[in-house]
Amino acid sequence: MDSNTITSFQVDCYLWHIRKLLSMRDMCDAPFDDRLRRDQKALKGRGSTLGLDLRVATMEGKKIVEDILKSETDENLKIAIASSPDPRYITDMSIEEISREWYMLMPRQKITGGLMVKMDQAIMDKRIILKANFSVLFDQLETLVSLRAFTEDGAIVAEISPIPSMPGHSTEDVKNAIGILIGGLEWNDNSIRASENIQRFAWGIRDEDGGPPLPPKQKRYMARRVESEV
């Protein structure tokens, strides 16, 4: 196993521990807690894949961070902060919406680009809106936390979420996953619209009539993929 992979995991475990302490002391906001829960799942998945104990990894990560801080200067810190862009966190969904349990009568799942797409194919003839929580860097979607599809009465009928045990995903991975989700829901004559944030930061467009965010060419391509899978 690559030593850098182990070191990275150990440091991630310790930094998560520090963030957890902040949360326990009520020193953070809702997006911070949201990322904390997501990263906990990711660390458990990585630990299982690597065969490493989280507690031991956290202690080793503490030693690594302490050694780095001993040699760190204020000037180096200023340079690092100045050269690093600051990602923004976009929240279409409330904590209740993103954490609510939901169930499928006719479940369908697909893995694409490190993302899990889930949808209930029993849903028919509904008006559905897509909402997502994600980070933005350089005015473009960087990391998806969760995307869910809601009916007009608030029921959850589909979801896209990162797979904790797999490496990260790209903006294109998210676009493809949304295309699969839209195609699957439209198969049953549902009407889909995406939130303005999804349209703006995933595709760089604003759809004034609230229609699906996919460009026609890509939407047709995704629909054909879904038809062949169904």
Curated annotation (Swiss-Prot):
<dbReference type="GO" id="GO:0030291">
    <property type="term" value="F:protein serine/threonine kinase inhibitor activity"/>
</dbReference>
<keyword id="KW-1088">Inhibition of host RIG-I by virus</keyword>
<comment type="similarity">
    <text>Belongs to the influenza A viruses NS1 family.</text>
</comment>
<dbReference type="Pfam" id="PF00600">
    <property type="entry name" value="Flu_NS1"/>
</dbReference>
<dbReference type="GO" id="GO:0042025">
    <property type="term" value="C:host cell nucleus"/>
</dbReference>
<keyword id="KW-1114">Inhibition of host interferon signaling pathway by virus</keyword>
<keyword id="KW-0694">RNA-binding</keyword>
<feature type="short sequence motif" description="Nuclear export signal">
    <location>
        <begin position="137"/>
        <end position="146"/>
    </location>
</feature>
<keyword id="KW-1102">Inhibition of host PKR by virus</keyword>
<dbReference type="InterPro" id="IPR038064">
    <property type="entry name" value="NS1A_effect_dom-like_sf"/>
</dbReference>
<keyword id="KW-1192">Host mRNA suppression by virus</keyword>
<feature type="region of interest" description="PABPN1-binding">
    <location>
        <begin position="223"/>
        <end position="230"/>
    </location>
</feature>
<keyword id="KW-1090">Inhibition of host innate immune response by virus</keyword>
<dbReference type="GO" id="GO:0039524">
    <property type="term" value="P:symbiont-mediated suppression of host mRNA processing"/>
</dbReference>
<dbReference type="GO" id="GO:0039580">
    <property type="term" value="P:symbiont-mediated suppression of host PKR/eIFalpha signaling"/>
</dbReference>
<keyword id="KW-0922">Interferon antiviral system evasion</keyword>
<comment type="function">
    <text>Inhibits post-transcriptional processing of cellular pre-mRNA, by binding and inhibiting two cellular proteins that are required for the 3'-end processing of cellular pre-mRNAs: the 30 kDa cleavage and polyadenylation specificity factor/CPSF4 and the poly(A)-binding protein 2/PABPN1. In turn, unprocessed 3' end pre-mRNAs accumulate in the host nucleus and are no longer exported to the cytoplasm. Cellular protein synthesis is thereby shut off very early after virus infection.</text>
</comment>
<dbReference type="GO" id="GO:0030430">
    <property type="term" value="C:host cell cytoplasm"/>
</dbReference>
<dbReference type="InterPro" id="IPR004208">
    <property type="entry name" value="NS1"/>
</dbReference>
<dbReference type="GO" id="GO:0039540">
    <property type="term" value="P:symbiont-mediated suppression of host cytoplasmic pattern recognition receptor signaling pathway via inhibition of RIG-I activity"/>
</dbReference>
<protein>
    <recommendedName>
        <fullName>Non-structural protein 1</fullName>
    </recommendedName>
</protein>
<dbReference type="GO" id="GO:0039502">
    <property type="term" value="P:symbiont-mediated suppression of host type I interferon-mediated signaling pathway"/>
</dbReference>
<feature type="region of interest" description="CPSF4-binding">
    <location>
        <begin position="180"/>
        <end position="215"/>
    </location>
</feature>
<keyword id="KW-1103">Inhibition of host pre-mRNA processing by virus</keyword>
<dbReference type="GO" id="GO:0039657">
    <property type="term" value="P:symbiont-mediated suppression of host gene expression"/>
</dbReference>
<keyword id="KW-1113">Inhibition of host RLR pathway by virus</keyword>
<keyword id="KW-0945">Host-virus interaction</keyword>
<keyword id="KW-1262">Eukaryotic host gene expression shutoff by virus</keyword>
<feature type="region of interest" description="RNA-binding and homodimerization">
    <location>
        <begin position="1"/>
        <end position="73"/>
    </location>
</feature>
<feature type="short sequence motif" description="Nuclear localization signal">
    <location>
        <begin position="34"/>
        <end position="38"/>
    </location>
</feature>
<keyword id="KW-0899">Viral immunoevasion</keyword>
<feature type="region of interest" description="Disordered">
    <location>
        <begin position="208"/>
        <end position="230"/>
    </location>
</feature>
<keyword id="KW-1035">Host cytoplasm</keyword>
<dbReference type="GO" id="GO:0003723">
    <property type="term" value="F:RNA binding"/>
</dbReference>
<keyword id="KW-1048">Host nucleus</keyword>
<dbReference type="InterPro" id="IPR009068">
    <property type="entry name" value="uS15_NS1_RNA-bd_sf"/>
</dbReference>
<keyword id="KW-0832">Ubl conjugation</keyword>
<keyword id="KW-1190">Host gene expression shutoff by virus</keyword>
<comment type="subunit">
    <text>Homodimer. Interacts with host TRIM25 (via coiled coil); this interaction specifically inhibits TRIM25 multimerization and TRIM25-mediated RIGI CARD ubiquitination. Interacts with human EIF2AK2/PKR, CPSF4, IVNS1ABP and PABPN1.</text>
</comment>
<dbReference type="InterPro" id="IPR000256">
    <property type="entry name" value="NS1A"/>
</dbReference>
